[in-house]
Amino acid sequence: MNSTNMSLKFRSRSAISVALVDQLMFATTIAIARGIRLCAGRSQYLAATCTPSRFVNKFQVRSSSNSKNIDDKLQTIIDSSNLGAVKKQNEANNKSRNASDTVNDTNTAIPSSSETFHQANADEHTISESTKRAILAENPTLPSQRERLRTETSKRIETYLESLQKTIFRATRTLNDATGYSSIEGLKNEVEKLEIELRRAKTTVKECKKAYTDAISVRSQSQQEVNELLTRKHNWSPSDLERFTELYRNDHTNEQLEAEAARKLTDAESKVDSIQLKLTQSILTRYHEEQIWSDKIRSASTWGTWVIMGINVLLFFVATLIVEPWKRKRLVASFEDKVKVAISEVNLSNTDSVVEKNTIPAPEASALNETSFSSQISLEPSLLSLSWSQWTWTKFSNYVKSTTSRVLYGNGEIQAIDARLLLVISTFLGCILGNILSGR
């Protein structure tokens, strides 16, 4: 501990001594600079008073240069000391403060300009809005005006229709994915692409054929000209010799061009053949897949038809055996209740003598109603009451009409045999209809 305290004290004393030495050096440098300046001023004064005028300018220039050099040396000494560093730091702080003040001034000046700009934009916007309103008022049939005059109900209906269209599209796509028609659509698109590619390949073949024909014609013309020159070989001129040499030299080039054109033509034709084969195979595949899909849909529609027919038959049985008897019983019960109420009211309102003379007793009235109802039922036609000789198409159609009206509207009572007969007829007609639909 004592050693550390001693070291700290020594360090602090050394730092204090260094600071004092720096201050003394700075003070001495200042004193030296002042003395040098004073001597320079005195020398200038003596030179100005004692020397001639022609030597004054030279001496002033020399003295000014010497003073500048002295000032520079003094400035370097001051800058190298601690006080010079503190002075530099203070100057840097002052510069940063001045820069921040200028930035703040510019920032305060900018909002005013931005405010004027926004105000000008607002004025221009109001002018444009007023002009736009005037134009819209002059032309009320514009689409924007019609859109503005539309009610919320029409907008909701339009939105609902758009959502319904999207829903139908999604449902259709889902149904196609479920039934496998999406893959058939992919085959259809592939066939269309192959057709376009086949057209392009055929165009390329035509171009290659034209190039091959041109190459053959050029070579044949050169060979014909060579043959003509060879026929008059003994009468060649220097130009004929040069022409023969040129033709003989170009013959090899023409042969290469012809071979290249033939190769390109062969490649183009082979490409057309491959595309044609691929297109034919894609068309056959698409046709086969469409046949399978149509068979699947046809079988599904047949089963759906049979299911619908079964539901109709079930509803017919339910309506005939359950609903109609229940309705009939309820109607009869309500009718009997109304008759009883009416008879009781008549019995209470009239006296015994008036009832005996002018009214019919309740049992007789009910018996009369039952007999009239049974007579109406007995008047209904029935096929069992007819013999084979009495069967005609008119009687059969009348029977069907009356039975159908009784089934649909509840006009009278339907017998069990009539229900069975109608069931057999409807089943027979349903089987015929199902066979016709499935045969398609």
Swiss-Prot record:
Compositionally biased tracts (Polar residues): 91-113
Lineage: Eukaryota, Fungi, Dikarya, Ascomycota, Saccharomycotina
Similarity section: Belongs to the SHE9 family.
Highest taxon above the source species: Eukaryota
Protein localization: Mitochondrion inner membrane
Keywords: Coiled coil, Membrane, Mitochondrion, Mitochondrion inner membrane, Transit peptide, Transmembrane, Transmembrane helix
Any one of the GO BP annotations: inner mitochondrial membrane organization
Region Disordered: start-end pairs: 87-113
Coiled-coil stretches: 180-215, 259-283
Protein name: Sensitive to high expression protein 9 homolog, mitochondrial
Organism of provenance: Meyerozyma guilliermondii (strain ATCC 6260 / CBS 566 / DSM 6381 / JCM 1539 / NBRC 10279 / NRRL Y-324)
Side Mitochondrial matrix, residues: 36-302, 438-440
Quaternary organization: Homooligomer.
Mitochondrial intermembrane compartment segments: 324-416
